[in-house]
């Protein structure tokens, strides 16, 4: 085992990560157990409550297992049909979009407790208001960050990586589109979790996710481009969004027409218009190279037009 550590630094790196995470978790547990009376471990017999918790946790696990399976198997498919460079491009695209999506995730994290609290207090009108508006503003926030990156992606990648793997920019652009769908799903998922009856929505969304790998395999078998894999994922994410909206309508009374207009049609119309205006504006002004000032200018133009549209809407 020790010889493996000397010969393969990657194994040593993995072991050290496990040790660090385990030690960190143990220290958290020890501190909380000593300082906080309410966090001490004790065994209490609440059979019905335990059963309900296990049921909800089980459905949540079922909904997330397909995602983990897809991540691993898609990497395997890309390695089977293409060179490792394509897999490297996929890794870069996931890294970039995860960083971009973090901004909208922070907003949704702050809204999540309010959605759950509103349902618990039977304030369903406020809960639906929060779901729709957090979806809309998540799109806007993600858009402000994404637009400058989207417009000068090749230049940014060349500055960052110098030698950019083939397909990287295509993968990132398609994955960014999927990020908008993912940020729309989160408030809906919180609303469904709040009411507790998550069996059917999580079952069908999990089933939809399971179709990603077989469909991708068929496309690659017929020698389609690797970008097809990402397009399939986006289409499935759209299907999952439809499933979430449908069950939110049934279980928590979300108006489909109101949601489609306020969280989809209107925000994305604004996004399309502002993208066009930003492109036309920046094509007529002098902005040096690919640096900070270009990104700042694009973000400023986007933010200004978003504020104008929201003021008119109010």
PLM feature spans:
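Membrane-interface junctions at transmembrane-helix termini in multi-pass inner-membrane proteins
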Residues: 1, 6-7, 11, 32, ...
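Hydrophobic alpha-helical transmembrane segments
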Residues: 1-34, 56, 206-211, 225-247, ...
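Helix-terminus/linker motif at the lipid-water interface of multi-pass membrane proteins
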Residues: 2-6, 68-99, 117-118, 151-164, ...
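Interhelical loop/hinge segments that connect adjacent transmembrane helices in multipass membrane
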Residues: 6-14, 28-72, 110, 114, ...
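Interfacial/gating helices of multi-pass transporter permease domains
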Residues: 10-15, 49-56, 77-98, 125-130, ...
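Helix-loop junctions and terminal segments of transmembrane helices
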Residues: 36-37, 93, 97-135, 142, ...
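Alpha-helical transmembrane segments of multi-pass membrane transport and lipid-handling proteins
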Residues: 128-183, 210-221, 272, 276-279
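Conserved small/polar residues in nucleotide/adenosyl-binding loops
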Residues: 304-311
């Amino acid at each position: 085992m020790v010889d493996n550590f000397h010969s393969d630094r990657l194994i040593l790196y993995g072991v050290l990560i496990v040790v660090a995470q385990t030690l960190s978790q143990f220290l958290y547990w020890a501190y909380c157990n000593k300082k906080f009376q309410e966090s001490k471990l004790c065994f209490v017999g609440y059979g019905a409550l335990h059963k309900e918790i296990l049921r909800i946790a089980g459905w949540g696990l079922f909904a997330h297992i397909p995602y983990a399976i897809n991540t691993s198997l898609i990497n395997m498919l890309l390695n089977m049909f293409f060179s490792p460079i394509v897999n490297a491009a996929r890794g870069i695209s996931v890294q970039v979009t995860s960083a971009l999506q973090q901004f909208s995730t922070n907003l949704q994290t702050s809204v999540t407790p309010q959605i759950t609290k509103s349902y618990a207090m039977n304030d369903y009108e406020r809960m639906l208001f929060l779901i729709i508006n957090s979806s809309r503003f998540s799109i806007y926030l993600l858009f402000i960050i994404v637009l400058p990156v989207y417009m000068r992606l090749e230049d940014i990648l060349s500055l960052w990586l110098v030698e950019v793997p083939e397909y990287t920019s295509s993968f990132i652009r398609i994955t960014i589109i999927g990020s908008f769908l993912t940020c729309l799903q989160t408030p809906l998922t919180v609303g469904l979790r709040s009411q507790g009856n998550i069996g059917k929505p999580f079952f069908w969304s999990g089933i939809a996710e399971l179709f990603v790998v077989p469909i991708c395999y068929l496309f690659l078998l017929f020698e389609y481009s690797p970008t097809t894999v990402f397009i399939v994922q986006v289409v499935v994410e759209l299907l999952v969004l439809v499933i979430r909206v449908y069950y939110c309508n049934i279980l928590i009374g979300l108006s489909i027409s109101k949601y489609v207009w306020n969280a989809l049609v209107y925000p994305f119309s604004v996004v399309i218009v502002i993208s066009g205006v930003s492109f036309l504006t920046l094509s007529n002004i002098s902005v040096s190279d690919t640096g900070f000032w270009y990104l700042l200018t694009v973000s400023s133009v986007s933010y200004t037009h978003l504020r104008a549209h929201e003021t008119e809407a109010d």
